[in-house]
Amino acid sequence: MIGINQLDLDRNLIMVMIDIENLHLISFNFIEELYAMNLDAVNPELESKINDLVCETYNKPFLEQEKLLKEAFELIPKPVTQWAHPTTMVTIALFELYYKNQKYEQAKEWLSIALSVADLGPTNAGTYLLAGIFYYDLENYDEAYKYFDIAYNDAGYYPFSIEDKKYWQFYKQRKDELNPKKKTKK
């Protein structure tokens, strides 16, 4: 790797890396987004404070968890959709809190925010898998399949491997129904 050449320093920053060994040219548009995806790269103290609030919720009653998680969410710089982390961490924690307590409308609101930042980070299969599980458990099978399919296309079977097998079985069966293998008769 010979290094990075900065071609433009405004918001439309383009950086080019040239890998001489493999003769690849890789360009990144909006390179600042690579850093903005993770608050820790920009403001590690704030990231740590948010992490501490989320950790503090462990084994607390519902109302205390809710208060701490919403406090953590308010600390995330606006717009929250620019940060893969900690937005995903906090919104998934709020989603799970409401979901476990059968407050499905609130759970859905927080899941929606988590999904809005899912593609900012390097790994997003877990967020999509949670969305699939949520909709499956609410018997909204079309939405469940949609999110399971995104998770599968992103990470294969692995995210399903740590969940109840019914989700994988549902996904596989629906996928086979929607994409039947063509059999030719001779």
Question: Where are the regions that the model predicts?
Answer:
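Residue-level signature for tetratricopeptide repeat
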Residues: 55-59, 97, 134
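Alpha-helical adaptor scaffolds
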Residues: 77-121
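Boundary/linker segments of alpha-helical solenoid repeat arrays
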Residues: 80-83, 120-126, 153-166
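TPR/TPR-like (Sel1-like) alpha-helical repeat modules
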Residues: 140-158
